[in-house]
């Protein structure tokens, strides 16, 4: 007999878990112990446990560096304080069409408002932090009745992922706990097992093991559009509950999970990050701190040597304490057996500082705190040059974030907003749509995403700088030659548009080609009218002078008239 859906899910969960635990879990546990002790959930029993988990950490430099990375990535890539993405069309000419440009700008603004209302900006720093330390992070963007979309982060060790044939994550399984009350709220009482129903009456806050799978729907029936025949299925079931019983089965048209990976090698499913690069130095740092503390304690409380006659007698090493020695015993002294060489403490501190620098370098602290760490005042040009140099090191990481995290996130938010708006465009549901109806010129075109965050702008600063230098050089040549024809080679309209694009000027501030042409035609007409008025004035003035000229005498005018 063929396995039921529940049995298939249980078997695949076991296979994915075994692959993850045997290959990746030991390293993740070590990274959690030494860098992010509060992150990672390697047993379902770890939920809601508040005891200390940092007992292996003496020097938390790597923890602080990971915090700087998470804050720097969030502020630099997805800061809610400024627009960090904009939409476009594959056809650049279509972008110059007024209605299309206005619609895209309105959609961008509406999407930013939805993202700000949701919990996205609370979740992203956690995602960046876990990705930097463990190399892989995961979160889901699910529909929400109140905020349109809500984001759910999954900590390391609580989920398993798998790749598609395109080496993109298309499967996520996870094991987690819910209280009996939460299960009733989410799935309804009728879907719960008898055990959980009993807990609702006896202890509604008791924790229950739940499993969730989101994966491609291989049992999809083409042509049907109900929630069990969508491209991806989402299935919840109670671990250890009634056989073949599911808590809920639904689906998604788009994969709702974002699983960014810092760096991936070949066919690997999970990634590696800066945490893996500096874990050795971080462990060495803890050992050095322990040895430094031992050395300093030996200096403050050294091992003591005393005459045998003091055995069993009162002796003191406290400040101001007195220990009396036998006068008859020659050479008997009460003194330290080992004196610490202070130079070793300074040398050990230097080694500790070197190991700390390795952690800072691994987590790009020198990039995100570049200005504050400069030892002297620098010019703005030098700071900008250094920033461009540092961005070269972070460039590949940013490109992977765009592909694994930000593109799917924006696509999912846009998809959910379109779903909310379609029925309201058609008048089937009351209320205002989140998005305005698109202009007919867009048709079925796919939109293009362009990132305008601080880090993205810093990467494009090279392009803007080259345009500035080109225009400046052309102006210098024209000034030296005292000939404006040197500027004929420069297409100023195109130069301005490319520069505005490089520095991410809002599209509403840049006029379309048609608007610019209309302004120039109006200006030319005004100049022509002014020139005609000046010419007409000259003709009138000439006629007036001619009418006042004396033609009775012998002068040039009478001679000319006579000759005619």
Language-model region placement:
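Structured, contiguous alpha/beta core segments that scaffold functional sites
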Residues: 8, 14, 142-319
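Extended, helix-rich architectural segments
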Residues: 1-206
């Amino acid at each position: 007999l063929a396995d039921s859906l529940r049995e298939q899910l249980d078997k695949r969960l076991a296979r994915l878990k075994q692959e993850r635990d045997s290959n990746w879990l030991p390293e993740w546990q070590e990274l959690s112990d030494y860098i992010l002790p509060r992150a990672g959930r390697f047993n379902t029993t770890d939920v809601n446990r508040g005891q200390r988990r940092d007992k292996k950490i003496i020097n938390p430099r790597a923890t602080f560096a990971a915090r700087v990375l998470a804050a720097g990535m969030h502020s630099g890539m997805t800061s809610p304080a400024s627009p960090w993405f904009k939409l476009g069309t594959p056809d650049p000419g279509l972008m110059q069409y007024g209605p299309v440009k206005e619609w895209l700008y309105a959609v961008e603004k509406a999407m930013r408002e939805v993202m700000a209302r949701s919990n996205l900006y609370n979740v992203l720093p956690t995602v960046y932090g876990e990705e930097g330390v463990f190399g892989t992070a995961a979160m889901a963007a699910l529909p929400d009745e109140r905020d349109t979309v809500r984001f759910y982060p999954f900590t390391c060790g609580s989920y398993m992922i798998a790749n598609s044939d395109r080496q993109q994550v298309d499967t996520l399984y996870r094991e987690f706990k819910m209280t009996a009350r939460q299960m009733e709220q989410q799935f309804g009482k009728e879907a719960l097992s008898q055990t959980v129903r009993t807990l609702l009456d006896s202890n509604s806050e008791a924790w229950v093991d739940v499993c969730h799978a989101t994966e491609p729907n291989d049992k999809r029936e083409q042509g049907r559009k109900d929630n069990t025949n969508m491209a991806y299925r989402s299935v919840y079931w109670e671990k250890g509950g009634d056989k073949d019983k599911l808590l809920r089965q639904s689906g998604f048209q788009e994969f709702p999970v974002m699983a960014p990976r810092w760096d991936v090698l070949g066919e690997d499913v999970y990634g590696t990050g800066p945490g893996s690069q500096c874990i050795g130095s971080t462990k060495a740092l803890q050992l050095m701190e322990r040895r430094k503390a031992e050395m300093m304690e030996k200096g403050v409380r050294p091992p003591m040597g005393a005459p045998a006659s003091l055995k069993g007698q009162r002796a003191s090493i406290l400040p101001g304490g007195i220990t009396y020695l036998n006068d008859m015993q020659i050479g008997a002294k009460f003194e330290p057996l080992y004196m610490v060489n202070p130079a070793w403490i300074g040398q050990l501190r230097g080694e500790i500082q070197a190991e700390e620098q390795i952690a800072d370098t691994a987590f790009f602290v020198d990039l995100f705190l570049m200005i504050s760490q400069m030892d002297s005042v620098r010019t703005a040009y030098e700071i900008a040059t250094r920033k461009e140099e540092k961005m070269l090191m972070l460039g590949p990481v940013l490109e992977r974030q765009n592909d694994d995290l930000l593109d799917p996130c924006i696509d999912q938010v846009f998809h959910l907003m379109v779903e909310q708006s379609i029925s309201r465009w058609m008048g089937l549901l009351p209320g205002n749509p989140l998005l305005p109806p698109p202009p007919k010129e867009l048709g079925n075109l796919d939109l293009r995403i362009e990132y305008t965050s601080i880090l993205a702008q810093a990467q494009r600063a090279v392009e803007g700088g080259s345009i500035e230098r080109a225009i400046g050089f052309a102006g210098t040549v024209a000034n030296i030659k005292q000939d404006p024809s040197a500027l004929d080679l420069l297409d100023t309209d195109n130069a301005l548009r490319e520069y505005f694009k490089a520095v991410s000027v809002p599209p509403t501030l840049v006029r379309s080609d048609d608007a610019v042409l209309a302004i120039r035609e109006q200006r030319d007409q005004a100049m022509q009218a002014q020139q005609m008025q000046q010419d007409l004035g000259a003709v009138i003035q000439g006629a007036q002078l001619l009418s006042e000229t004396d033609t009775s005498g012998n002068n040039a005018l009478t001679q000319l008239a006579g000759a005619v």
